[in-house]
Design a protein with these regions (language model features):
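Conserved functional hotspots at enzyme active or ligand-binding sites that engage polyanionic ligands
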Residues: 1-113
Length: 113
């Protein structure tokens, strides 16, 4: 991907998640971008969820079926990261159904009473 790449919602990108603490995902790993390109471009940040290959049947996992990456998006581990300093690299795109499922699980988690 060219140096002019700007992440967009639905993209799968490789990011460096280190440093992290506790149960958070760390290391260089794929993530699903949730924020739109216009936000990512203006702020230099992106909102994303990490992807794991260790599928455990956890309620907030969203299985990804595309050829770009195998695993599950962790919809409850939302991050807002500097995508340039975390060395974002484009890997592929998830389906509209998959991004809708991530957003639905996130909405359930953030429901305010």
């Amino acid at each position: 991907m060219s140096a002019s790449y700007i992440p967009d919602a639905g993209d799968i990108v490789w990011l460096n998640f280190t440093p992290q603490t506790g149960h958070e995902q760390a290391g260089r790993r794929p993530a699903v971008v949730l924020s739109p390109k216009v936000y990512n471009s203006k702020t230099g940040l992106l909102v994303c969820v990490p992807i794991t290959s260790q599928i455990k049947g956890y309620p907030f996992e969203v299985l990804l079926s595309g050829a770009e990456v195998s695993g599950a998006a962790l919809a409850d581990q939302v991050k807002n990261l500097d995508w340039r300093s975390r060395q974002a690299r484009y890997k592929g795109k998830i389906s509209i159904a998959e991004i809708q499922e991530i957003k639905a699980k996130l909405a359930a988690l953030l429901t305010f009473v």
